[in-house]
Each structure stands twice: as structure tokens, then as C-alpha cells.
Amino acid sequence: ASQGFMELAPPVLNSPASGSSARPFITHHNTLDIDMYLRIATELHLKMCIVGGLERVYEIGRLFRNEGMDPMHNPEFTTIEIYQAYTDLRGMMDLCETLFSRCCQLVNGTTRIQYQGMDIDLTAPFARLPMNEAVKQYTGKDIYGCGSDEEARAIAKELGVELKDKTASNGKALAELF
């Protein structure tokens, strides 16, 4: 709120499902006698509010995706979705840095945390690197500088990343390595 954001509460039940290509959970609204869908994203509702003139909106809420489940993917999860008019990627990066830094300070009394044996400093601003530069810095491999997609896939494999798509581009290899 200190930065002029308005918290919204988009509907959890939708008809039709929208905002992502994920499969929704389906329920039935008895009074209206129609199928309804638990939301898979809040994106469209929040973007409609931006188009309608609200310049800074967010929601912290539950999403539901009727898809696979494993230790990294739960069908029900909480997200924060933030939209802001009249900014660009750098403005959103600044916002996220401030959010992480302030939350860490409020919760821990410091902007430093220990995670998996590492000391992480969440003091803004953070280091900003293009993906290829980050991968090059941490692996010594230049995915965009290699000669072909095939070579990029070989580098990924050498670094322990097996690409499911055997025709993946160097961009896909870079994304998986990142």
C-alpha cells in the first residue's frame, strides 16, 4: 500500500476457465445449473482492472491446476500477481527487489538469510545478468556463443541437463541450464 498498490480479490469460481493453458478443476453451480471452474490464474481479471484505470494492482491468492503432482508441483498453491501501468521490465525488477528486501527485513530483522548452507544477502539492488551471462559465469559455457543447437544440447548434457526434446534450440538449452 505504501507504493500505491490496491489489493484486489478476483473471483475464485469462473465460467469459462481463463488465463492459462492449464487444466482447471470443475465444479457445478446448482442454482445457475452451470459448470464453473476453479481459477487457474488471476492474470486476466487484474489486467482488466489495469485497462479500466487502476494503475497498480495485486493479489495474493490461491490458484488451482488439475495437472500432475510431484514434490515441486501441487494442484493448489498460493501466488502473488502484481501489475503496474507505465513501467517496464526494469521497473518491475526494482519493485520485486524492494518487495524481497523489505519482506526479509520485516520477517527476519535483517536482509540476510541462510539457505541450504549459503548466506544470501537480499539487500537491494540485486546483481542483474542476462541469462546467457549468468550461465556463462557459473558454468564457464557460452550457450549463445557455441556453433549450433546440437552443440548447445551437448553442453547441456555435459552439465547434467538432459533435454527431453532432442531438437531443442540453444535458447531452450539455455533456459533449462538457467
Outline where the language-model segments fall:
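Class II aminoacyl-tRNA synthetase catalytic cores and aaRS-like
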Residues: A1-F178
